[in-house]
Design a protein with these regions (language model features):
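PG/GG-rich flexible active-site loop of Rossmann-like NAD(P)H-dependent oxidoreductases
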Residues: 9, 63-66, 105-113
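Active-site loop of short-chain dehydrogenase/reductase
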Residues: 12, 50-63, 98-101
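Catalytic loop of short-chain dehydrogenase/reductase
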Residues: 7, 23-27, 31, 57-84, ...
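Short glycine/proline- and charge-enriched loop/turn segments
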Residues: 22-23, 75, 116-125
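C-terminal helical subdomain
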Residues: 98-107, 113, 121-166
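A short, exposed helix-loop element centered on a Lys and neighboring polar residues
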Residues: 43-44
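Conserved NAD(P)H cofactor-binding loop of Rossmann-fold oxidoreductase domains
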Residues: 4-15
């Protein structure tokens, strides 16, 4: 199972506003449900069957906001609940690894190539920061097929031309 959900509303922060003054509570609540409640509910449905089978993979697709918050980047600032996704992956790793279930948090620290992404000013100015979705899928497949003797529980994918978020 790959949990990969996002939310686009509320990404534009006017220069004269601060996040708390601009962001309606309803937008935050939707983002929080997607980033914290969503993966919990999917895991609650999927992991017991994986535990019973003694095998399975649960991968959480995350972003750099799970590692640190950033000022004035609304889309990422809004997603600080993604820290909860990372914590959930860590807890599920502790609980389910011994039952043969591989859980990992995958941090996609960049822009994923798509027509919409290519239209963004940042992607047009620096095309090398755009990540190939096929290569991202390859990384997910690599995690899924890893030998149990050396599972990866967190993987950060970053374009070569940028510094990884920490």
């Amino acid at each position: 199972v790959v949990y990969n959900a996002g939310y686009l509303e509320g990404r534009e922060l006017p220069p004269e506003k601060e996040l708390l003054e601009y962001m309606p509570v309803e937008i935050f609540e939707t983002a929080q449900h997607i980033a914290s409640r969503g993966p919990f509910l999917v895991a609650k449905e999927a992991l017991p069957a994986m535990r019973e089978r003694g095998e399975g993979t649960f991968l959480i697709s995350n972003n750099a906001a799970s590692l640190r918050g950033r000022k004035r980047v609304t889309g990422q600032s809004l997603y600080y609940p993604r820290v909860m996704m990372r914590s959930l992956a860590q807890v599920l790793t502790e609980e389910y690894s011994e039952h043969g279930v591989h859980v990992a948090n995958v941090v996609i620290d960049g822009l994923i190539d798509s027509p919409g992404t290519r239209a963004m000013p940042a992607a047009q100015q620096q095309p090398e920061i755009v990540m190939d979705p096929v290569k991202i899928a390859d990384a997910f497949f690599y995690l899924h097929t890893q030998d149990r003797s050396c599972w990866t529980h967190e993987l950060q994918l970053t374009p070569f031309s940028t510094h990884p978020s920490v």
